[in-house]
Amino acid sequence: MKFRTWLFLFPLLCLPAWAAAVDYRLPPNATPAPPTEGVSAEIQEQLTAGQRVTRGGRVPFCDVWLARSWTTQADFQPTAAVIYPFEAGQFLGLVRYARKGTDYRGQEIPPGVYVMRYGLQPVDGNHVGTSVIRDFVLLTPADMDQTVAPIEEKALAKLSAQVAGGTHPTMLSLRHVPEDASALPALRHEEEGDLWILETAGQSAGGEALPVAVVLVGQAAE
């Protein structure tokens, strides 16, 4: 019996890593309506059309709605560490997880609806190695975050920690959108770290397109 079990398992154990990996997709023409339960009317009014990410092409994983427009810092110049012209605590959009996910630190994100706000990773010894880029999306419970107004950084960190139920904010890493990126939105896979990155575009308050890239699946290397 043990020998037969081994014969059954052997082909599975020999599969290459890519064969066992979960595939995520961005189905065309999937524009889910934003949720209303637990989401304030103020936030609902500020959302664009939704973008759905699925597992394996059919199973919903999460839906993302960007804000209609983003306030940006005047005369902002990106650096190697800070690439987006946002202010800490700024409202960026909304995300709904149909099933549990994980943030960039590996913390569990329960199914639910969360407000997306901009945050900057502190420059201190507690965050060495997490990411060279300090730009992050911090998630907050939608039923506890009812305004599009900015939130003070310490209050945001405390509120965001409630998503994962720990002491650290629940955070998704922001990345560069490649210069050769063609049509947006798109879902890009980075084999190193097995990251799935949503590349999409919002717009500034002045009407200029502002591409962004957020890691929806995957976490920092330990």
Regions inferred by a protein language model and the residue ranges of each:
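Positively charged n-region of N-terminal signal peptides that target proteins for export
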Residues: 1-5
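Primarily secretory-pathway and cell-envelope proteins
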Residues: 20-83, 139-222
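A short tyrosine-centered beta-strand micro-motif
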Residues: 112-119
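Bacterial N-terminal signal peptides
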Residues: 7-16
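Short consensus segments that form the blades of beta-propeller domains
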Residues: 126-130
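N-terminal post-signal-peptidase region of extra-cytosolic proteins
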Residues: 77-81, 91-100
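Extracytoplasmic
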Residues: 59, 90-92, 109-111, 132-134
